[in-house]
Curated annotation (Swiss-Prot):
Disulfide bonds: none annotated. GO terms for cellular component: cytosol. It comes from Acaryochloris marina (strain MBIC 11017). GO terms for molecular function: ribosome binding; rRNA binding; translation initiation factor activity. Pfam families: eIF-1a. This is Translation initiation factor IF-1. The gene is infA. It comes from the Bacteria. Keywords: Cytoplasm, Initiation factor, Protein biosynthesis, RNA-binding, rRNA-binding.
Amino acid sequence: MAKQDAIEMEGTVTESLPNAMFRVDLDNGFNVLAHISGKIRRNYIKILPGDRVKVELTPYDLTKGRITYRLRKK
């Protein structure tokens, strides 16, 4: 999958699952299962339920994604 093919959306983490998987409610109402990208894992960025995140989705499977960024709280 090329980088430009990814669909990037924002959402809220609703549930933390084993193996660094998370259930994320997207802003458009869909619910996806997402894992953490390598840079977030390498830099030990903690993701907790309630955090706002950016998720990359592939056009082939819109039910799974990758968390690429944790948004700052305002």
